[in-house]
Amino acid sequence: MEELKPTKKSPLATLTNAELAIEKIMVMAKVRLKHLERHRTTCPDTKELLHRIEPIDNWLVRRMESYIEANPAYWWFSHVKGAGRELMSKLIGEIEGFGRYYDVGDPEIPPYVKREPEEYIILDEDGNEIVKKGIWVEGIERLTTPSKLRAYAGKAPGRKPQKGAKLTYNARLKMLTHRLEKSFMQARGSFYTFYGGYKDYLEDRVTTKDGKKVMPTPKARYCPQCDKEVEVKRARYCPDCGGQLSQKTEPPGIIYKGHVHQMAQHRMGQLFLDLLWHVWRESLGLPVREPYPVEKQEHTSIIRPEDMMDKSCGKKDCPICHGKDFERRQNESY
């Protein structure tokens, strides 16, 4: 039998797909055990399932983290507070998973992709293998503009679930971007500083331009069945009757602080995706473009990727931080 050689293609997309699937199973198993524990019971099979898949999940995370260093944008996001290795490996894996084969001569193939056609296998509806020939286009190569990455991540206007229609974005990438936003909030780094400034700008804009008043978000939500207000933070159903709670609707002329917070956090996530797109493509020598405000609206100020670098990657041989604290190193006179 012919000995097969290891492929040079990164398996990060495949590993990410497997890890996120196992993560979902682990969460379901833990929730089930927690629920049974409240009723003073347990399930040995669920415990055994968790015991068997946790080592696989740990192995997947370690392998994903080892591959993330090969990403062309690693030099940048490894110096950003809140962009942890595990989270970034999943996010990058989802973007890499956007790559696909195109038929030779397909007009959708970007002009800068010069790869030779190669054979690949697909399965038909009956599970039979079909050998085809096509040109491979990487995920970041397909995302020709920053707005396309935003749209793919569900961070563009109108990218919401529609009843009876297929999603127009990658739900898992949107979830991972939301996790990253939460991580930035906790890290209190450059992106958190941007969030704070943009939040102040939004509050000033809605009060001076739109004439609205910014009010604290009410804790209570109304239950029609119980005919009362219920104080819950994230629940959708009444803890007493189980009925669905009403949404928190803003009265005319009022905008809740929670709404402003979500808008600012959303913009922070968009900024990261824009900068990641720019660094990744520029490092590969792919065409890049200036941000929309600069290119179309003639703005003069711009946030560069280097402006958001605020931590050490921990490696002494790093040509950027030399293993030193990034903030302290910037204050040194040399």
Ranges and model annotations:
Residues M1-R38:
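Phosphate- and other anionic-substrate recognition elements at nucleic-acid/protein interfaces
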Residues A13, L20-V27, K47, H51-N58, ...:
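Generic structural signal for well-ordered, non-transmembrane alpha-helical segments
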Residues K30-E86, E94-F98, Y102, P110, ...:
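Helix-hairpin-helix/helix-loop-helix acidic hairpins
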Residues P72-A73, G82-E118, G127, K133-R142, ...:
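Catalytic DNA-binding helix-loop module of base-excision-repair DNA glycosylases/AP lyases
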Residues D124:
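Post-HExxH zinc-binding segment in Zn-dependent metallohydrolases
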